[in-house]
Amino acid sequence: MGAIPKNRRVVYHHTMRYVLILMTAPLWAQTMDQLELHQVAASKVQYEGKDAVRLLARPNVANGESYAILKGERFHNGTIEASVAGKPGANAAPDARGFIGIAFRLQGNRYEYIYLRPTNGRADDQVRRNHSVQYGAHPAYDFDRLRRESPEKYESYVDLQPGVWTQYKIVIEGTKARLYVNGAVQPCLIVNDLKLGDSQGGVALWVGPGTEGYFADLKITP
């Protein structure tokens, strides 16, 4: 192998191959040691044809407390992409929705996040469908507060199925974020006033209470 350009980094793939990338972070090249776990159990698995990381939220964990931080990742503006699949776990409560998404700009216990409710995507209740996608800012701005103070502003509909791979992409610039699902040209959720402002911080894989979540194909582009 020749000289490696300074603006690139090499990660060691778990199948004993070297992968050369430009400013990205492929999830399946991460080891469990590179994930800082918060109230989740994590494992490497094969799921629906993909090398993936599975996260299981710990029982009786408060909303917003279960995630896995990518160690050493510092994010400000850019794009975060992943394949995600979420579904209620075996012992989940009846109101579990398979909550799954990405948290960004983590600073201590504060972060922004956009997540999916896969069981809502094809529900027979239109109100539930309208709540398929959600933005929040932990810990002060959870879904309940945002729904009370600004109904329908921070959530929307998108077609989802529990346990099925969904292409997830968020584009973040300053105090704005856009979520694109399954290669759509138009965003399914637009947030023009990120509650933590034009900040920067870490990135985490996020699951909500009762979720069995899978993550693959992660790419972070500044």
Where does each model-flagged region fall?
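Short carbohydrate-recognition loop motifs
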Residues: 46-62
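Secretory/extracellular carbohydrate-interaction modules
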Residues: 67-140
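Flexible glycan-contacting loops in extracellular carbohydrate-active proteins
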Residues: 189-216
